[in-house]
C-alpha cells in the first residue's frame, strides 16, 4: 500500500494551514493518529460503526512499486511488420501480428512510431486490436505523435483495443478449484480469514472471497423490493492474493482488507480465481474514431434509440475505445482521445472511452478522455467505467464532454480511487438534436 494516499488532504492544505490548524477541521474519522481499521485492536463493524477504510492499496501492485518502464524486446510495427504510419493503408493486421509476436515471446513492447495508424475490426471480430497474453506493452511515441485511428463506425458493442484473458466472470469457480467456507462472520475490514480448511490453497494464490446476495441480505439493506438482480449479481465479492497460510488455525492471510461484511448466513466462502493476464501496458498514444456518416440527421439519435435496430444510435451503442477485462497488475498511462481530421464534428469517440471490468490492481494515470458522439441512454458516453473492478487507481486523469465522466457500477466494485481527477462539461452532446442528459460527473455506485 502507498501511505501517500492517506495524507493527500493534509498535503493539499499545507500551503494555507499548519498541520495543527488543519487538524482543527479534519474529520473525526481521520484523526492525526489514524490507523487502518483492520489493524486496530477492536476493528470496527461495517453495520454499526462509521469508518474510513484504507484505500491506499489501489493501483498497480497495490501502489507499492512504480509502474515499470519496460525496455524490451521491441516489436516495431513499421520496420518489422509493415504498418503504414501515414494512415493511408489499413494497419490492423501488421499491428496485430506484432502483438501476437510479443505474446509468443513471453512479452515485450509493441512500438508504434510517430504517425497515424488506420485500424478497424476484421470480419466479425469484436475489436480492432486485441491483447490476450501477459507482458505485452502497446507503446506509442507520445499522445501528440502516435494516433490510432479507427475508421469503422458500425461498432455496436465493439472496442478499438481490447485487453482480456480467456475465461468468465469472477463468480465462476474454476474447474478443480478447492472451495472452503468462511467459518465465522467478518463484520469489519479483515485480512485474517478463518476458514473450514486450507487444503488446496497456497501462498501466492489469487482467490475469491464471496457471499450470496440472499433475501436476508437484501432485506438487511431495505432493498428487498429494489434489488431484483440488477447490479447485485452473485453478491459481495472480493479478489485477493494469499500472502500466508496458518494450517494449525486454518487461517488465510490476504493482501488487501475486505471492504464489506461477509456472513456465514450468506454462505461466505473462498475459491480460486480464474485466469487473468498480468503486466499489460497501454502507453503514450492517442486514439480516435471516425464519426458516423449520418451524424447530421435529426432522427435516429434519441435517448432510447440505442435499442432500436436500424437507427444510427444502434450502430454505435456500447462501443469503447479501450476495454480491459480479467486483467491484473497492469496500467494505462499517457493515453488520450483525439478528433480525427476526417470528423466534421468535434467528436473523439462514438460512445465510450475506457471500460475496466473484472480486473484488479490497475493504474490509469495522466490520461484525457473526452467528446462522445452519441450520449444516449443504456450505457453510452461514459469516459471511465469501472464495472466489477477492484483496487483501481485513476490518477491525474481528465474526462469531459460526456454523459457521465467517472462510473463505478455493480456490487463487486470496491476499493477504487480517483486521485486528482477532473470531470468537466457533463451532459454534453456532439449531435444537434441528439440525445442529451444533465448527466453527472460521477455515476452509479460509490466505492466500498
Question: Model regions: which residues?
Answer:
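Short glycine/acidic-rich loop motifs that flank beta-strands on beta-rich extracellular proteins
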Residues: 107, 121-123, 143, 149-152, ...
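Positively charged n-region of N-terminal signal peptides that target proteins for export
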Residues: 1-5
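Extracellular "leader-to-stem" segments immediately downstream of a signal peptide or signal-anchor
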Residues: 14-310
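Alpha-solenoid helical-repeat scaffolds
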Residues: 280-379, 384
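Active-site-proximal structural scaffolding
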Residues: 131, 200, 235, 275, ...
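Bacterial N-terminal signal peptides
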Residues: 6-16
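Extracellular beta-strand solenoid repeats
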Residues: 111, 118, 130, 137-139, ...
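Right-handed parallel beta-helix
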Residues: 135, 144, 278-289, 328-341, ...
Amino acid at each position: 500500500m502507498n501511505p501517500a494516499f492517506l495524507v493527500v488532504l493534509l498535503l493539499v492544505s499545507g500551503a494555507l494551514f499548519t498541520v495543527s490548524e488543519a487538524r482543527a477541521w479534519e474529520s473525526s474519522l481521520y484523526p492525526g493518529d489514524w490507523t487502518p481499521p483492520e489493524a486496530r485492536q477492536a476493528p470496527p463493524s461495517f453495520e454499526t460503526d462509521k469508518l474510513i477504510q484504507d484505500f491506499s492499496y489501489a493501483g498497480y501492485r497495490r501502489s507499492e512499486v512504480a509502474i515499470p518502464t519496460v525496455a524490451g524486446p521491441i516489436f516495431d510495427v513499421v520496420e518489422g511488420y509493415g504498418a503504414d504510419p501515414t494512415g493511408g493503408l489499413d494497419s490492423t493486421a501488421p499491428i496485430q501480428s506484432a502483438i501476437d509476436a510479443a505474446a509468443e515471446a513471453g512479452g515485450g513492447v509493441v512500438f508504434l512510431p510517430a504517425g497515424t495508424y488506420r485500424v478497424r475490426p476484421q470480419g466479425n471480430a469484436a475489436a480492432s486490436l486485441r491483447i490476450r497474453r501477459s507482458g505485452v506493452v502497446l507503446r506509442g511515441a507520445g499522445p501528440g505523435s502516435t494516433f490510432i485511428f479507427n475508421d469503422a463506425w458500425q461498432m455496436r458493442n465493439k472496442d478499438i483495443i481490447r485487453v482480456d484473458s480467456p475465461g468468465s466472470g469472477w463468480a465462476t469457480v474454476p474447474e478443480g478449484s478447492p472451495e472452503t467456507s468462511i467459518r465465522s462472520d467478518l463484520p469489519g475490514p479483515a485480512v485474517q480469514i478463518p476458514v473450514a480448511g486450507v487444503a488446496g490453497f497456497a501462498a501466492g494464490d489469487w482467490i475469491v472471497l464471496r457471499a450470496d446476495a440472499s433475501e436476508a441480505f437484501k432485506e438487511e439493506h431495505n432493498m428487498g423490493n429494489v434489488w431484483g438482480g440488477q447490479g447485485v449479481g452473485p453478491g459481495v465479492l472480493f479478489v485477493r492474493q494469499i500472502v500466508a497460510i496458518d494450517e494449525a488455525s486454518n487461517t488465510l492471510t490476504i493482501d488487501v482488507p475486505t471492504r464489506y461484511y461477509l456472513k456465514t448466513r450468506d454462505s461466505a466462502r473462498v475459491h480460486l480465481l480464474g485466469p487473468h493476464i498480468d503486466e499489460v501496458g497501454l502507453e503514450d498514444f492517442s486514439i480516435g474514431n471516425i464519426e458516423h456518416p449520418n451524424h447530421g440527421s435529426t432522427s435516429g439519435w434519441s435517448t432510447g434509440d440505442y435499442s432500436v435496430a436500424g437507427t444510427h444510435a444502434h450502430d454505435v451503442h456500447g462501443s469503447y475505445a479501450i476495454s480491459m477485462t480479467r486483467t491484473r497488475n497492469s496500467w494505462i498511462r499517457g493515453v488520450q482521445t483525439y478528433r480525427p481530421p476526417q470528423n466534421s464534428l468535434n467528436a473523439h469517440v462514438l460512445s465510450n472511452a475506457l471500460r475496466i471490468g473484472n480486473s484488479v490492481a490497475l493504474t490509469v494515470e495522466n490520461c484525457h478522455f473526452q467528446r462522445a458522439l452519441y450520449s444516449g441512454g443504456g450505457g453510452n458516453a461514459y469516459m471511465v467505467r469501472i464495472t466489477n473492478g477492484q483496487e483501481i487507481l485513476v490518477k491525474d486523469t481528465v474526462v469531459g464532454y460526456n454523459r457521465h465522466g467517472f462510473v463505478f457500477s455493480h456490487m463487486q466494485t470496491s476499493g477504487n480511487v480517483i486521485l486528482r481527477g477532473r470531470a468537466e462539461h457533463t451532459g454534453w452532446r456532439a449531435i444537434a438534436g441528439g440525445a442529451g442528459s444533465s448527466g453527472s460527473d460521477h455515476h452509479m455506485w460509490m466505492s466500498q
